Amino acid sequence: MVDASGRAAAEGWRKMEAPPDGAADLVPLDRYDAARAKIAANLQWICAKAYGRDNIPEDLRDPFYVDQYEQEHIKPPVIKLLLSSELYCRVCSLILKGDQVAALQGHQSVIQALSRKGIYVMESDDTPVTESDLSRAPIKMSAHMAMVDALMMAYTVEMISIEKVVASVKRFSTFSASKELPYDLEDAMVFWINKVNLKMREITEKEVKLKQQLLESPAHQKVRYRREHLSARQSPYFPLLEDLMRDGSDGAALLAVIHYYCPEQMKLDDICLKEVTSMADSLYNIRLLREFSNEYLNKCFYLTLEDMLYAPLVLKPNVMVFIAELFWWFENVKPDFVQPRDVQELKDAKTVLHQKSSRPPVPISNATKRSFLGSPAAGTLAELQPPVQLPAEGCHRHYLHPEEPEYLGKGTAAFSPSHPLLPLRQKQQKSIQGEDIPDQRHRSNSLTRVDGQPRGAAIAWPEKKTRPASQPTPFALHHAASCEVDPSSGDSISLARSISKDSLASNIVNLTPQNQPHPTATKSHGKSLLSNVSIEDEEEELVAIVRADVVPQQADPEFPRASPRALGLTANARSPQGQLDTSESKPDSFFLEPLMPAVLKPAKEKQVITKEDERGEGRPRSIVSRRPSEGPQPLVRRKMTGSRDLNRTFTPIPCSEFPMGIDPTETGPLSVETAGEVCGGPLALGGFDPFPQGPSTDGFFLHVGRADEDTEGRLYVSCSKSPNSHDSEPWTLLRQDSDSDVVDIEEAEHDFMGEAHPVVFSRYIGEEESAKLQEDMKVKEHEDKDDASGRSSPCLSTASQMSSVSMASGSVKMTSFAERKLQRLNSCETKSSTSSSQKTTPDASESCPAPLTTWRQKREQSPSQHGKDPASLLASELVQLHMQLEEKRRAIEAQKKKMEALSARQRLKLGKAAFLHVVKKGKAEAAPPLRPEHFAKEYSQHNGEDCGDAVSKTEDFLVKEEQREELLHEPQDVDKESLAFAQQHKAKDPVALHELERNKVISAALLEDTVGEVVDVNECDLSIEKLNETISTLQQAILKISQQQEQLLMKSPTVPVPGSKNNSQDHKVKAPVHFVEPLSPTGVAGHRKAPRLGQGRNSRSGRPAELKVPKDRPQGSSRSKTPTPSVETLPHLRPFPASSHPRTPTDPGLDSALEPSGDPHGKCLFDSYRLHDESNQRTLTLSSSKDANILSEQMSLKEVLDASVKEVGSSSSDVSGKESVPVEEPLRSRASLIEVDLSDLKAPDEDGELVSLDGSADLVSEGDQKPGVGFFFKDEQKAEDELAKKRAAFLLKQQRKAEEARVRKQQLEAEVELKRDEARRKAEEDRVRKEEEKARRELIKQEYLRRKQQQILEEQGLGKPKSKPKKPRPKSVHREESCSDSGTKCSSTPDNLSRTQSGSSLSLASAATTEPESVHSGGTPSQRVESMEALPILSRNPSRSTDRDWETASAASSLASVAEYTGPKLFKEPSSKSNKPIIHNAISHCCLAGKVNEPHKNSILEELEKCDANHYIILFRDAGCQFRALYCYYPDTEEIYKLTGTGPKNITKKMIDKLYKYSSDRKQFNLIPAKTMSVSVDALTIHNHLWQPKRPAVPKKAQTRK
């Protein structure tokens, strides 16, 4: 538990173990009383504020005292002060302005003053605290605690505010306003603390780096590097908070903040900064915090060690006021000792580094390097290798943390990691990139299992605990010459960081051979590409060097023609054991980032760990995608950062299945800017085309489509089929870019679990690069500088390229990737809000496209950089490679577009057939598709012709509203798609892959003659401009539209249409923007326009598919208005069972809102549809091309039906390549599409109904459980006639809504009436019960008086019985008693308890928790605590005469008795409850007390212990209560038998005279005014005549009260 090596820990532990040192005072958690701690902390705070910490009156310093029974109570002076409001007025006067202070005269004035400041005094149950609560005589402590909390909050608000925090943080850090802006004070505190801790991380990282550089020298580099590494291991861990109370309880974060502001007073070495702190460490830190506060901050720490350590939630206001005070001291007061640390301290160091980096490199001979690689013994030194410059070999080192501001000048102005509270500071990105992910405590994304043990990580290290995120982990690429790592395993290159939403550092993608046939073979020759990877971990630091000169054995099928110089890429994975490995290669053979030594972990084959085990180990953020294939698919992405490229340089590496021999001269760094990466987003994958050594069809297209990745939440890696490979399915590389993406990625990860190709996303974190290397890289990779700032990738992803091509050329709604790309292509260069705001702000992410940079453009941007050195040459040639890839990718995208068009055509025909089927049920003859005029006429009869104007008004409103909603909703849905796409592309078997390939060929052939034009990529630029205009227009109209929408709904008249019933769900229009393409004037009337089956987004939240505004298109005269989806359910994918919406065949598909997309200029209305193929749990998402009309004309109905049905049955989910819809997502269609269940085509008799789902008719049989749905457009040339029908449908819908609303209102009224009746009935019952109770009490009283009179007469010889003048019991006890005859039992409420308790006997526990405990004197727990609250008369008048003595009986013996009452018995005490302890107490302390009676008492108690009866009765001689005998009472039989003593053997009902109850706390018996025995009776007397006349010689007359 305790790290003895840590000074703080050891010291703290000593204190805890040695009681004399004071640590024994620590209250264990199980005995820690949070309620008491709250009272103590609040009283200490308010007294300190009222009087000054050093001037608190002596009697107020400790507010508690312990009474004789060792119970803790609040001192009367404190209670008096609280009740008098003096403390509150004093403290409140310190906050208020001068003239307001005079008005503070009492509790109410303080409450009002606080409320004027927006702070309301509320108890924990949200009831407002009133003046009466605060001045109530038995103090109500909960109200006073709420008052003190409100004053603390007022103080907090005075000292800290969100604005102040933001202003403070801006001085030393940067952040994303859209993601990280605090939303309340607590969040602001967490924000401030985290930012300071991140700043400290940066500073310490820079210091470590500076020391490294200064210590290094060519002669002693290795030794010094090693030594520095060892010292760096001790580097402190600066924690980041997620929860203020939970994460801040160890004091480490606050001490780090104090150190930042007061480095001289709080030395960093004095603070115990560990990732996992023990209790001793925490205690040490808290003591340190308290000492600092007492010495420098005016003793503002008002908590105990336990308060801070256990951090109960009730103390949150106290902790917050302390943090606010810290902030106030450091940011407002700023005493002399406050001197914040800053980067300024490192400027001199930076200058030194610059000078050093400008020196010529020190050449190191190949022989020297080989010497380190030659023997394992050299491993220890090899990993100490210094930064080596190898200019001639093109081995570009990358420094992954640019420090200089100019690095960030090009479009990287503000990084915006999606995760909040992560560092976005430009100038410190270098040092915190490794830390901003691990900073989420205990969720470290560092190079450990988070993903660093990717699901196929070459090393499974179950024995290793997760890497502390505290380590400043400089990760570099490491080459393992000893080949300890299995090169063929997917985790040989364990990419140590998943693409996570907060990743700011470079990402690494590695597709490594997952299933090489002979893994050990490559290990033996040590030349496999992946055998270059040595995953090392020396004291939790990583260095990885990629060796590029490895020549795989030609016999190894996995590396058919891999170039000897193919650049390998590895990610850093932590290895489990501390083995060292030689890690240097020849000068031209590795990329080195030698920041810290690393230790080689054993190869995976040495460990008996299955892939499943490894996968199970991965942390939530790790992402590993695998695809089944014959051989592993190679993809290595490497990031090499130029001086300004923010680690955006990629080196593609040919590998295994794709035989690409890339000459070393051609493999250079390719700068691919991925905005998403700058923002912690997607990977950028450099694509490369195979050279003649490999088939031209081979190759990975690993593209970074920035627009795609940022918003879509994933990246496509499409691999084109190579002749020697057996599959060509696209890979889906997922990344997470938002909070909600985590789940998607995790699920996708599970989906890919069993598949073969590992696609490991990672990013270097904490990579430290010497300034010398940085300087070198400036020259070598300068060509990447200008456009490597994180804009859209020049190398589009297959999907994005395809999308943009098809979007530009054919107005086809390909995929939302394409739309998103178009929307981003034109953006400003600054990336600050592109990623961070994607999920939060409606417009920033969508209207902020980044410019599209092609490889050619990129080449032109920095022509002067090419040819200056081999590195530039390599890069320029790789640029050419990428340009070739671009062409190839365009061809593939065109093919995909054709496939989508084919699918759209099939869907069109299928939908048409379904519509025919539906219509035939309404018409006797089997005719061609029913013309829309039929419906138009029918509806016009019902609706009249007068509704057109109103509808046309509504149409414009709704279209605009849809556009607005699209903008609002799209960013939120972006992240939902990654899992969907992953599922969609998860090929179940090779057959599906072949089927996909065959489909591609077929679709290409089919569409070659039907699609009249080739995709023109250049149209993207035009659409981009128009898109931006559209978006800006829509943004301006948002506010107006929201008002117009409501007006629209009110204006629409309703016309009843018989025979139809509409859905009545009342929803707002939240539809995304839909644009419908211009219709071809030559469209055949009998054919509908091909539907665009758009993107069903895999939105777990159930949002509809987001549809983009591709661009404005002029339309011809044939343009007709097309209604968009209904107002009701567009945004909500709500399933409507078919059975719930019976429809007549006369209104199929017309039940839609009439909102033509129609401004006269005509925007293309893109409608999204989801076709849910339930058999595959996939979605076919198809997009229509702009030639869809032609397609629909040329394909016969039969062909379409056959093709569609066949397609639905097959695994053709890859056709659309983008979206999928979860299984449970209801089928939804939009606008003028008809959605028809395919099962109805195959089984027409199954369901004869049409179910209207807002924009269309869905034919669904028994709910949504259908394998497929077809869609088709209605012919737009008949739109005018259909418009009338749709108007009618719209009005019908309005009418139905009104009817539904009316019915709903009636139901609500009925429910309210029922509730009222119930309340009246209960009130009547209560009244009757009270009357009965009153009558019964009166009866009892009369009986009692009568018997008392009779008793006086009978006992004349004995004298009048004394009425035992007992002092009334405290009201608190009084509240808990019960009438023995009442038969009722009600528990006392906390309020009554605290209201009636007197201050002197107030128990702390009962005051703090308002629970009726510990009010019994002597600390004896009450065995029978009940309440008299149900008998208000009896329970509220303790000062009655003797006839009410029984009322004051103690709660300790107040079981309800069952009286001789014939009315309803509310409660019967179970007879199993025993009164043995009470009788024991009575005999010991009352009946036989004293030394004289001790022998007798002992004998009686012995008998009592021997007996196992439940209930006992004491027999008294008479009203004088002289003890005579002890009896056992059996309530079931109501028999009373003598146990011991003097008296009759048994007592019957008739013998009983009086009944008594014993009060344990007052040690006396009280007479009960009842005649009937019950278990609540403790003693009794029998009639006097039953006693023998002989009196005992020495009667023992016990005192009734001791």
From Swiss-Prot:
Which spans does this entry mark as compositional bias, Low complexity? 797-808, 830-841, 1206-1220, 1393-1410
Q: Which UniProt keywords apply?
A: Coiled coil, Cytoplasm, Cytoskeleton, Disease variant, Intellectual disability, Lissencephaly, Microtubule, Phosphoprotein
Coiled-coil ranges (or none): 873-909, 1016-1048, 1291-1343
Where is region (Disordered) located? Answer: 426-471, 603-637, 772-808, 825-870, 1075-1165, 1206-1226, 1301-1448
Give the UniProt subcellular location, in the record's own words: Cytoplasm, Cytoskeleton
Domains (record comment): The CKK domain binds microtubules.
What is the official name of this protein in its record? Calmodulin-regulated spectrin-associated protein 1
As recorded in Swiss-Prot or TrEMBL, the protein's gene is named CAMSAP1
